[in-house]
Amino acid sequence: MLAPDTVLQNRYRIIGQLGRGGVGTVYEALDQRVNAVVALKETSVGDGNESSREFESEAGLLANLQHPALPKVMDYFVEGGSEFLVMEYIQGYDLLEMLTRRGAPFHIKLVLRWADAVLELLEYLHQRQPPILHRDIKPANLKITQQEEIFLLDFGLAKGAAGQMPTLLTNRSARGYTPLYAPLEQMLAQGTDARSDLYSLGATLYHLLTNVPPADAASRFQQLEDGKPDPLLPVHQLNPQVPPSVANVLHQAMAI
């Protein structure tokens, strides 16, 4: 963990830690060259030149993305045994924080508005050549600003779709996921495609609309294999404000 006031690249001064996950740590930092606050994502350096090429490829991939729901990637570097992405700092609260503080489901109209924005973003990502997958969509990675804009964060897991990407990106980007929101194929390391992001978005919306964490895909699969009912209850049974048509869309998105 980097201590406050640590300076990297003679430029970025650490202010404090914003979050920590299975694949890295995110810090708030001051870019002293332009006097602007940025977010620094740190991950451990892998072994050899291959890892360096992977990092440069992934960072270049992210830096070329331009969408209003994505924080901009502005710089990247390696220092002290770690790789760093320098990203636009987004002020606001993530949806897991907001849901926990609220203690009740969000209103259906609000969730559908967020869903439309994220689906538009996923269309942008999935239609790129090669297609880009996020692979860790969840409430904690969606941040709402004071202007009520939504941003999808934590692209340390982003990768091109299998078979349409530099091979070096595959292993690097498979290092982590969040079980509650991950599709079965990702949990079993069987490869992912655009449908995997849609499963994760469906699981995220399920949580936001019910205030109940969704049953994970592996547990659901085992229950179904054992001839037992799917433990994932329909959304409209948990929240009567959700129309059956919306519940059906989420059920299809989260199909095992």
Where in the sequence are the language-model features?
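Activation segment signature within eukaryotic-like protein kinase domains
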Residues: 114-115
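Protein kinase catalytic-loop region centered on the HRD/HxD motif
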Residues: 119-132
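C-terminal lobe helix-coil module of Hanks-type protein kinase domains
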Residues: 180-256
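AlphaC helix of the eukaryotic protein kinase fold
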Residues: 42-64
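Conserved N-lobe ATP-binding subsite of Hanks-type protein kinase domains
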Residues: 25
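Conserved short submotifs of the Hanks-type protein kinase catalytic core
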Residues: 80-94, 98
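Activation-segment/catalytic-loop signature of the eukaryotic protein kinase fold
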Residues: 76
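Conserved N-lobe loop of protein kinases adjacent to the ATP-binding glycine-rich P-loop
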Residues: 30-37
